[in-house]
Amino acid sequence: MDVTVSQLVELFLQSPLVTWVKTFGSFGSGHQDNLTLYMDLVDGIFLNQIMLQIDPRPSNQRINKHVNNDVNLRIQNLSILVRNIKTYYQEVLQQLIVMNLPNVLMIGKDPLSGKSMEEIKKVLLLVLGCAVQCERKEEFIERIKQLDIETQAGIVAHIQEVTHNQENVFDLQWLDLPDVAPEELEALSRNMVFHLRRLIDERDECTELIVDLTQERDYLQTQQPPSPGKFSSPDSTPSPTSSLSSEDKQHLAVELADTKARLRRVRQELEEKTEQLADTRHEVDQLVLELQKAKQDNIQLAADARSARAYRDELDSLREKANRVERLEMDLVRCKEKLHDVDFYKARMEELREDNIILIETKAMLEEQLTASRARSDKVHELEKENLQLKSKLHDLELDRDADKKQIEKLLEEYMVLEMAQKQSMKESAHLGWELEQLSKNADLSDASRKSFVFELNECASSRILKLEKENQSLQSTIQGLRDTSLALEESSLKYGELEKENQQLSKKIEKLQTQLEREKQSNQDLETLSEELIREKEQLQSGMEALKADRARQIKDLEQEKGHLHQAVWSLRERPQVNSTKDVEKENRALHQAVTEAGSKLSQLELEKQQLHRDLEEAKEKGEQAEALEKELHRLEKENEQLTKEVTSLKAATEKVEALEHQSQGLELENRSLRKSLDTLQNVSVQLEGLERDKQQLGQENLELRKMVEAMRFTSAKMAQIETENRQLEREKEELRRDVELLKTLSKKSERLELSYQSVSAENLQLQHSLESSTHKSQALQRELSQLEAERQALRRDLETLQLTHKQLEGAEEDRKALEQEVAQLEKDKKLLEKEARRLWQQVELKDAILDDSAAKLSAAEKESRALDKELARCRDVGSKLKELEKDNRDLTKQVTMHTRTLTTLREDLVLEKLKSQQLSSELDKLSQELEKVGLSKDLLLQEDDGHGDGKGKTESALKTTLAMKEEKIVFLEAQVEEKESLSRQLQIELQMIKKEHEQLRQTQEGGDKAQNALKRPPGKVTSHQEKEAWEPSHKEATMELLRVKDRAIELERSNAALQAERQLLKEQLQHLETQNVSFSSQILTLQKQSAFLQEHTTTLQTQTAKLQVENSTLSSQNAALSAQYTVLQSQQAAKEAEHEGLQQQQEQLAAVYEALLQDHKHLGTLYECQSSEYEALIRQHSCLKTLHRNLELEHKELGERHGDLQQRKAELEELEKVLSTEREALEREQKTNAIATSENQRLRGELDRISFLHQQLKGEYEELHAHTKELKTSLNNSQLELSRWQVRFDELKEQHQSMDISLTKMDNHCELLSRLKGNLEEENHHLLSQIQLLSQQNQMLLEQNMESKEQYHEEQKQYIDKLNALRRHKEKLEEKIMDQYKFYDPAPKKKNHWIGAKALVKLIKPKKEGSRERLKSTTDSPPWQLEPSDPASPSPSQALRSQTENPDNPPSGPNCVEERDTHNGPVGKGPGDLKPKRGSPRGGSVDRTDTSTDPAVKSWPSEPGSRTFSTSATTAALSSSTPIPKHLGRTKGCNSDDNLCEPSSEPDGPYHRQQASRPNSLESSRNASSNSSPLSLKGSSDHLHSRCESFSSADLIPSRDPATLSRDGNTSGRGLLGRHEYPPPRNGPVSQETIQKKGAASTHTGVRPHSASPSSEMVTLEEFLEESNRGGSPTHDTPSCRDDLLSDYFRKAHDPPALGGQPGPPARKDGAKMPTSFVAPTIKMSINTSEGQQLKPGHYVKPNLRPSEAEALAGMPSRQVQPPQSLSLGRPRQTTMTQNCHMPVSRSASLSRAFSLASADLLRASGPEACRPESPQKPGGHEAAGARETSTHSLQGSHILARERTPIVGKADSPSPGQGTRGRPLDTRRFSLAPPKEERLAPLQQSATAPALATGCSSGSNPQIQHFSPTVAPAVRTKSKVPQHSGEVATVAPVRPGLGTSEGDGGPGHGYSEGLLTKSPGRSSDLPPHVKRGPDDFSQGSSSKSTPASPEPGGDPQTVWYEYGCV
């Protein structure tokens, strides 16, 4: 038996349940045998301890800790355990234990049997079920997971037995459900039937057993009555009761009596209940129907409840996801910020790599130079000898040079004679020009004769000027040849200057590096501050923890007052989280301290590394100092270069590291900011309406950010669609969740009502009502959580959108996602368990209804405690999560620091390796340099032998070539070393062979070059000797012969130079080839570096993963330590409780004695009570019987009495009938018996009826209550439906809002796309125009250099220019005063409403240029014949064409000129400053009445200038002409009466002429002429310049036509200056009235006084200073100065020149060539551009004075009436074409232009807006807006040189459409300044009449297509007015900045304004202008920009500040 028991015990102890129990601490820890272990388990002490851990709720029952094999104590412990398990299952887990409970008696009496072991297994199984489902289930499951796999499987099977098997444990959670699915109902009903059967069977068995036992007891009691004594006699037979004492027998008798009484009661109740059952069955049948209906309602409610439960699960999962998403959001924000930084880092990396490459190259160069210098130091002795020989040769050359100087002096004398002759011719030409001007003033009546006369004079003058120019150029070429010979000797000295410049550059680099070091120091300081902030945050956390502790202490005190007797248990429970949290906080603080210390240590390491690097630098410096031997300056420079390269490499490494740390710190700061922002957004979401409004604002901001993102990251555009779809899906999910939440709310309300109804039913339990109220509070909390979840979901939706982007971009995020999914799975499991717990809590609430009042109170108190504990736990968890996040941040920082340290170590190793490699390379390079030097020496020796008399320049060149070859060798060597180190020797041999071959080739080429130079150098000696021989002959022919010989010699020198340059070019090409190879190798190196960087990133990711694992390990270890600490605390508490328990046991023992005494008394009393009760019952029965008998007897007595009386009365009768009565008596007695029986039955039935009626009333009450309950449910359902309908309405509203926001978002996206496309077009055109500007700047520089040669002419003409400039300045001051007066009347134009007109304009602007060009081509073909007139000399002159067109005024003019004419007439629509009344709705487009409206244009044009700015505001389009051009067109379409008011004839004799010239049509014509020709004029004759500007010479750039005031100003400036008419130009935007301008112009015509400008530009500038500044700054206008001697002659020559300069302001290029005054002579600005005819085209060629017809002609036939027959005759069409083709010559660009261009484009964009196109939207829907679009780019570039000087011109410029923008005409190529197609389309494009170029800007300047409607009625009226012709554009300066430069200013005309506009931009060109023109850019810009501030981009700003912001001279 012992063996079997031991085996059973072993098997039992090896079972998985026991192994699981062993995980609970001390059990089985000691070395005990199996039996003791088993007995310890059976005693129940340890199992009770486990149960205490599972269910820490206090219980009053004390466990017996010292069993000592006592059966009763063991049974007591086990019964306590089973009771606790049962209560825990029912109350906490909401489950019923259906299985038979473990038999405690069997375990206690016979623990070692197999059955008892099975019972113990049951106990362990139930304990396992509790442990797996309790609150600490995670901890217990973790313990189970640590066991073996087999034991785990066994435990899982046991758990399934408890949780899943309904036969063991029955789940009561379905009671919570209002209704259950039919399938589930079936399964439940089957289980219930099965359990019911089993329970009934068990009940029957128990009752039978009780009956048997009672019978046996009664029998025994009857057989053996209890003896009076305590002990029975020893002789008595042994019986079961004999052993019992008398007390026990009494006790048993009392119990038997109790059971009998109970049996009786039970039987009575059973009978009553059977009767009640029969009665209620009928009611049940009636209620079944109602129940079915209720069931259907319940089914629906159950489905809703199920969905609500599912949504609870989802809510929990969503909460977890929200927590997870917060983390992911933080990661996302970091990644986003890093993404933003990635582009910057990429650019920074590329820049640093480029800098590295440059530094490496410079290092290599310097090393080569060092080696070369060392070699040179070896050669010094030989070179000294050569130096002596060269000195002797130099002496000989100096003698030759002296002879050359004498010859040059003779030539200069001859040149002076020629210059004097030229000056005379200039004076004559000036006189002729004056005469022409006089004639033009007096020749209004006879147009044709006047034109022919002007043409003849211009032709004569131009022919003379051309001859003089040719002679001048020939002389200049000879002088240049002589100067080149003298400059050759000075080149060697320049090289030292270059080296010094390089040294300065290197010093600048050193300064930059020092600044970088300072930044690094700052970044280190920032890191220190960061660490301090972290410490502060840690302190804040500590303070927060202390506050939490204080709160907990307060809560503990409150709970102590409430729960006095439970104080110790609650205190122990609350101390645990405090201890744990404090320990965690301390650990985290330690970790943070460690991280901070590690960061500090790493920073110190970085500083140490920097110091080591500095030490390395110092060592390198010392080594460099040792290299000084010979040529100290060269060595010093080389050392500095080497030091710089080393410093750069070291500092770059350090800066990169510091920058990385800075960015990381910035990333952390940004993360903190993002978290704060996210908190703010969550708070904002709480209020839904405000949240929606803020969402709109946020969407707007997000749209802006998206636009920026679209510009910065275009590659994300494809992902946007996916993100939008995901966004919609998320919104749908959000809406579904909202619906679910609403359903949950309704369900919660229903549940509240049900609970209230249940409370009304169970009104007896008041304390249960409190518990139900607490449940309602919980439901409200759930509702709040649901609302919070809605807000969180919205935040999560945004976060998810960003997350999806980052998941696609980042690979590491995918791994994190997988890990997070696993966590989600675990969290979902936990969530399910929590849901089960919640269900159990609900079941507890329902079960408590059945429990007594005391238990309900205890449960409510326990619930309060649990809530407080939950709150505390939630707080602790929040704190723990925050601490965990801080830990993660800290670990990330530590990881980053470790990574930085590793990178530093790797960089150190790389530096060491690179140093070693550089040493090897330097040694190999030294060898190579020695070999090469040997080759160089041999070459030098050969050169000495072949060319003994070569100069030192050849040697320096050969040395440079050798250094270049050495550099190439080094590059090839480095490439080969990177590719293959093994083939190094082979590569070196190949390179040596190549170098030798190259040296041989160089030697051969140099020998040939030296021979050619010798051949060239010999003739000078001969020439000089010949000159000496012939110097004695005095004849002039000999001098000319000498000049011819000098020319021949120069030609020979040029040829030889060309041959040498070709050879040099070949060598450069070879060098470029080698450089390309070097670049390819460097790219390969970069790819390798990228691969290495990728591998490093991979390693970093792996390191981060390992770090994460370490962190997890550390967290687990910390948790383990915390659990062990908790266990120790619990043990100590247990020990204390055991001590208390022992004390209580003693008390219990004392109480037990008292209890036993009381029990005995109770037994006695019980027996007495039973006896009395039995007697009482018997008496009651007797009493009832007696009562019934008494009643019967009384009735009988009464009846008998009555009968007795009757019998006495009838005695006689009765006596007779006694026999009959005797028989009847017998019958009556029988009847009495039957009646007595019937009455008794009747009474019994009446009692039963009363009882049944009472039951019926009770059931009725219940039924009414149920009916009321159903009514309440229906009302609640109706209310919920109403709420649902309200929420649906709300949802529909929100949906509509969302759809509207989606529509607005799509609109914004479209707008963004339009802007991006427009930006791309603008950038393309800007790049194109930049290249053109560069070419123009180069040509301008060349021309300026040519102009500088003739300095004497400058001095002679300087006084005239200065006088005229002074007069103009004075005039400008007057104009400024009047303009400032006009500011008072400034009234900004009302803005239009339609913002989308700008968008339409944008769409049209984006149209391709080709369509516009085609349309313009069609329009040019459709234009009148004068437009495309062939170049036949026999063809009719433009004057004829003009006449023909003026004769037909009704025909609207076609081509671009129509636009300007329409400008003039449709003024009300074009909202320029001059059309205030038209803007306000004046219907008179071009009627005669317009004269009155614009009589005072100064007053009317000024206020309305913002309206004109609206033209320019579409800076994005920047296509429309300036604000001022429009007003004066529109304000004075007729111009007749208004011009009379605009002048003051009293002061000047020329006043009437001024007035007429200021008239509107003339200003229009002059504006056309100026716009088409002005800028080419202003180009100083550089046709190349104009052509290179390509389309940049838009009408805006070329004096756009809308502002005749400005046109007159710019067009006539130069002419006025020459003639003494200093008509002051109006402001660029034309704010000044023409009246004031003409008055001043007239006054200045006679006075000639020079006005002084108050602006800084009024300072006197000498002509030489002006030119020097222009040469230094690179004139942005690209105009090249030419000889000033032919200034006046150039005017006539320019008038005859074709518009090859791109349509210069001369009449031929103007739209209205006929409007040029004949008397006006533009200053000659010469250009050395040769046409195909061999003539040099001068800028002034186009400035032919044209005769201006009447204003009616100007209005009615601007394009048609070109009253310039002489001009058109002199304008050879072939010259037009050739000049346009020559316009492509390249020019150098000044450095300031690029910046000016960027500023211009920025200002244009700043000035833009949707309102910019408002005035133009009705004008020309198709073509014109598109035209403006293309012109923006051209104008922005045209204005780029202008912007360098002045900002305001840009607006005007931007406003005028580019010449190629009008859809009516061919795209105007500003290089040609005509509408003719480009030269690719036609070979003779410019064979038009002289008016063809005028058409060019006619289209462009007339940017306001409203002016199309030309009213011919105005023509006659206007024709009578203008009698004085205008000088339209005779200034050869760059196109004016202002678009509207009209000729309406009297004689000033376009020439003045034009030269002004150009001078503002090109100081270098002013020397060529007349003196009044040379007032400089300052004067004119001050005069113009200060007055035109309303049109400037910064209207409120000071014009002077605007001027100086862009830089004046």
Swiss-Prot record:
The listed location of motif PDZ-binding is 2006-2009
Region annotation (DVL1-binding) ranges: 2007-2009
Compositionally biased tracts (Basic and acidic residues): 1025-1036, 1410-1419, 1681-1697, 1866-1883
Keywords annotated in UniProt: Cell junction, Coiled coil, Cytoplasm, Guanine-nucleotide releasing factor, Phosphoprotein, Wnt signaling pathway
Q: Which residues are recorded with the post-translational modification Phosphoserine?
A: 227, 239, 486, 1435, 1592, 1798
Q: Compositionally biased, Gly residues: which spans? A: 1943-1954
Amino acid composition bias (Polar residues), ranges on this chain: 1440-1449, 1761-1783, 1898-1911, 1981-1991
Q: What is its main location?
A: cytoplasm
Extent of Low complexity compositional bias: 232-245, 1430-1439, 1510-1524, 1562-1581
Motif extent (GBA):
1652-1683
Q: Tell me the PROSITE patterns matching this sequence.
A: CH
Where does this protein reside within or beyond the cell? Cytoplasm; Cell junction
What InterPro entries does the database record attribute to this sequence?
CH_dom (IPR001715), CH_dom_sf (IPR036872), HOOK_N (IPR043936)
Which GO MF terms are attached to this record? frizzled binding; G-protein alpha-subunit binding; guanyl-nucleotide exchange factor activity; microtubule binding; PDZ domain binding; protein dimerization activity
Please give the biological process terms from Gene Ontology that the record holds. apical constriction; cilium movement; cilium organization; cytoskeleton-dependent intracellular transport; microtubule bundle formation; mucociliary clearance; negative regulation of canonical Wnt signaling pathway; negative regulation of microtubule depolymerization
Q: Which residues form the Calponin-homology (CH) domain?
A: 11-131
Q: Which GO terms describe its cellular component?
A: apical junction complex; cell junction; cytoplasm; cytosol; extracellular region
Pfam families cross-referenced by the UniProt entry: HOOK_N
Task: Tell me the SUPFAM superfamilies matching this sequence.
Answer: Hook domain (SSF116907)
**What's this chain's function?**
Required for activation of guanine nucleotide-binding proteins (G-proteins) during non-canonical Wnt signaling. Binds to ligand-activated Wnt receptor FZD7, displacing DVL1 from the FZD7 receptor and leading to inhibition of canonical Wnt signaling. Acts as a non-receptor guanine nucleotide exchange factor by also binding to guanine nucleotide-binding protein G(i) alpha (Gi-alpha) subunits, leading to their activation.
Query: What's the family?
Result: Belongs to the CCDC88 family.
**Domain writeup:** The GBA (G-alpha binding and activating) motif mediates binding to the alpha subunits of guanine nucleotide-binding proteins (G proteins).
Complexes and interactors: Homooligomer. Interacts with DVL1 (via PDZ domain); dissociates following initiation of non-canonical Wnt signaling. Interacts (via C-terminus) with ligand-activated Wnt receptor FZD7; competes with DVL1 for binding to FZD7 and displaces DVL1 from ligand-activated FZD7. Interacts (via GBA motif) with guanine nucleotide-binding protein G(i) alpha subunits GNAI1, GNAI2 and GNAI3 (inactive GDP-bound form); interacts with higher affinity with GNAI1 and GNAI3 than with GNAI2 and interaction leads to G(i) alpha subunit activation. Does not interact with GNAO1.
Protein name stated in the entry: Protein Daple
* Taxon lineage: Eukaryota, Metazoa, Chordata, Craniata, Vertebrata
